[in-house]
């Protein structure tokens, strides 16, 4: 079990610059309900259900924690980056969500929306408050509506999952965030420890288990959290520019000479010594912030996604690593592209795959739907997308992540409707006809430029200052 900090301690561990918003949201919530003709449903005393002893329970919780509710919120600065900050007080009735909690949460979301700031939530909750019954449960709908308004305004939500994050708090503030971080060992899951099946695998309900299942983006040690959150705030804060410039095309890192034949292009792209996506991303970005998982239970280690910083700009990236891309990879890519589009962040995609995974497991995991979703995410994007093919461009599994009209190629890459070996087999050609088939497919970098598929062949950076020399 992870350490359970109070709300104030969790805030202090993240930042020393915090200005709490006190009182207004409860008054506003009460006035709104009174105006709707339900003045008795304000959560005061024994609450909207008249639950016996509820007032005493809240009084004891307040005396024990020093808080008047299970949520504290206000304006904060983390690493010099402004945000609206929410922190749950688990010591106050298990951090549960009641009507007044909903007032505070809605006020926090509205503050972020109206100020154009990111929202950071430090979540530690057991879910809805039983003593307020359905009135408490409907606070989840309020949070969902407030979250939708925040997204529509173009602001981001970063959640930090503390111990525990369960029930409706996980299903709204946690899982509904754009970026989800968690502290090591935190209990994370929809079902709390007292209501899950007795034979359930306890590892599935941990931060580490959720990371492996593609439900969260990273597990961050407490001492690294302030820097990580500050970097994410810098990356996620919309620039305000209605038309961000495209991501610059990366310099090629591998071969300089163009392949003579189609088969030469295939062999160069498949060479184990050719630079891969990791090398390109390291050379391109000052630092990167990974986004992991499709939020549907899957991950793809052969696809790197996230946001990076380059020369003071934020650029989102989706990079294939030379393996067959899984359905979870395409879903993750679509998630990242849509987030970047919403925040006005340009996108860079690096293509390097023999094709989409096509085994039985991939089919059961929804390969077709996942690829279709990736195509749709790129087609819908209003921010500029830049693509560089750095190795194998294997059919639709590669094309799904390639920008129409803004794709570049390296000298040691190829792009083809199908692998030459597969084409020869489908055409019932002899095995020794594969090389000739590669030529007929016109898959070389220079062929792609001539066909209008690629804009240019990108060369390695010159040793001195100067622009790269495109060919074609």
Q: Each PLM stretch: what is its role?
A:
Residues 1-82, 226-315, 319-324, 334, ...:
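Intrinsically disordered, low-complexity segments enriched in small/flexible residues
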Residues 12-19, 109, 113, 144-147, ...:
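Structural signal for hydrophobic packing residues in well-ordered secondary-structure cores
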Residues 57, 86-94:
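Glycine-/proline-rich flexible loop or hinge segments
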Residues 76-89, 104-129, 307-321, 331-358:
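A structural preference for short, pocket-lining loop segments at secondary-structure junctions
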Residues 93-100, 132-135, 323-328, 360-368:
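Flexible beta-alpha connector loops of hexameric P-loop NTPases
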Residues 102-106, 137, 327-330, 334, ...:
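Non-membrane alpha-helical structural segments and their capping/turn regions in soluble enzymes
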Residues 126-242, 354-470:
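Conserved catalytic cores of soluble enzyme domains
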């Amino acid at each position: 079990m992870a350490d359970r900090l109070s709300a104030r301690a969790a805030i202090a561990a993240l930042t020393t610059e915090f200005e709490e918003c006190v009182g207004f949201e409860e008054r506003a919530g009460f006035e709104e309900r009174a105006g709707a003709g339900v003045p008795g449903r304000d959560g005061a005393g024994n609450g909207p259900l008249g639950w016996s002893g509820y007032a005493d329970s809240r009084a004891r919780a307040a005396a024990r924690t020093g808080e008047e509710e299970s949520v504290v919120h206000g304006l904060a600065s983390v690493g010099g980056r402004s945000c609206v900050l929410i922190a749950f007080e688990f010591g106050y009735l298990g951090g549960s969500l009641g009507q007044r909690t909903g007032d505070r949460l809605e006020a926090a979301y509205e503050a972020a929306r109206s100020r154009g700031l990111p929202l950071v939530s430090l979540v530690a909750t057991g879910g809805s408050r039983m003593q307020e019954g359905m009135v408490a449960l409907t606070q989840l709908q309020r949070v969902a509506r407030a979250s939708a308004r925040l997204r529509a305004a173009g602001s981001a939500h970063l959640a930090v999952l503390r111990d525990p994050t369960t029930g409706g708090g996980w299903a709204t503030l946690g899982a509904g965030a754009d970026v989800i971080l968690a502290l090591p060992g935190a209990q994370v899951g929809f079902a709390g420890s007292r209501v899950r099946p007795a034979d359930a695998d306890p590892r599935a309900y941990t931060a580490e288990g959720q990371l492996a299942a593609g439900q969260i983006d990273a597990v961050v040690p407490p001492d690294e959290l302030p820097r990580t959150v500050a970097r994410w705030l810098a990356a996620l804060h919309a620039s305000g520019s209605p038309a961000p410039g495209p991501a610059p095309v990366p310099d090629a890192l591998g071969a300089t000479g163009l392949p003579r034949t189609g088969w030469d292009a295939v062999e160069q792209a498949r060479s184990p010594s050719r630079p891969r996506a990791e090398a390109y991303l390291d050379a391109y970005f000052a630092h990167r912030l990974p986004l992991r998982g499709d939020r549907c239970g899957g991950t793809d280690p052969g696809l790197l996604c996230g946001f990076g910083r380059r020369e003071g700009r934020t650029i989102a990236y989706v990079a294939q690593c030379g393996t067959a891309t899984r359905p979870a990879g395409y879903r993750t890519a679509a998630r990242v592209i849509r987030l970047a589009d919403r925040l006005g962040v340009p996108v860079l995609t690096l293509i390097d795959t023999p094709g989409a995974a096509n085994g039985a497991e991939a089919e059961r995991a929804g390969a077709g739907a996942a690829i279709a979703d990736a195509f749709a995410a790129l087609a819908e994007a209003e921010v500029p997308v830049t693509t560089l093919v750095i190795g194998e461009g294997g059919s639709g599994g590669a094309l799904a992540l390639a920008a129409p009209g803004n794709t570049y190629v390296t000298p040691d890459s190829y792009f083809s409707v199908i692998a030459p070996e597969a084409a020869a087999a489908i055409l019932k050609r002899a095995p020794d006809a594969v090389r000739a088939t590669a030529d007929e497919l016109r898959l070389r970098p220079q062929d792609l430029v001539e066909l209008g598929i690629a804009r240019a062949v990108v060369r390695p950076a010159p040793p001195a200052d100067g622009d790269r020399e495109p060919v074609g």
